[in-house]
Amino acid sequence: MLRETEAAKRFHELVVPHLGEALGLARWLTGNKVDAEDVVQESCLRAFKAISTYSGGSAKAWVLSIVRNTCFTWLAKHRPKSLLLTDDPAGVEQMSRIAGDAAATPEAQLIAKADTQKVERAIFNLPHLSREIVVLRDINGLSYREIAVMLTIPIGTVMSRLAKARALLARELGVSHDEA
């Protein structure tokens, strides 16, 4: 068992750098920022309690696994069996930054914002398993292996689910799968 100061230091090194991504994943899974913040707070408590069990590997994948599991526990406790997502997605910070950097004029910024909102809505409209795979890979940047370990499925299943999810996303956005 780690002393509390050692545990706090490890928590700061392993968990804190990934809190933004943790909030993003929780937001995608819960559908809103307030619930996501609750999930991340609970995840931080769980991560701190389990910090001595971290055995190496990707800290990001470890943290996001805790967030994912906490999210499912939270949803089972606080949500009805059928989950309705709001049509007011708060956005993904990373996508907003990319859109903001590329937009030099007010007109370009409006177009970028509209495009970002369209993509966010399309992701929210994906079935849960598809949305989860897309968020973990394309937004949080986890490797196929990290996703496979997190979801306890073979890498091939990750790849096929991601391909299907991307095809659904392309269809939702009105682009051919070859263009996506």
Briefly describe each language-model feature range.
Residues 1-24, 34-37:
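A short, charge-rich alpha-helical start-of-domain segment used by transcription regulators
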Residues 2-5, 9-11, 83-84, 93, ...:
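C-terminal edge and immediately downstream basic/flexible tail or linker adjoining helix-turn-helix-like DNA-binding
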Residues 13, 118-126:
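Short amphipathic alpha-helical boundary/capping segments
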Residues 14, 18, 22, 43, ...:
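Residue-level preference for hydrophobic side chains embedded in well-ordered alpha helices
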Residues 32, 143, 152-157:
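Helix-turn-helix DNA-binding motif, specifically the short coil turn and the N-cap/start of the second
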Residues 38-45, 49, 57-69:
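Structural recognition of an alpha-helix C-terminal capping motif at a helix-to-coil junction
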Residues 65-87, 112:
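Arg/Lys-rich amphipathic alpha helix in sigma70-family domain 2
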Residues 133-137:
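A short pre-motif secondary-structure segment
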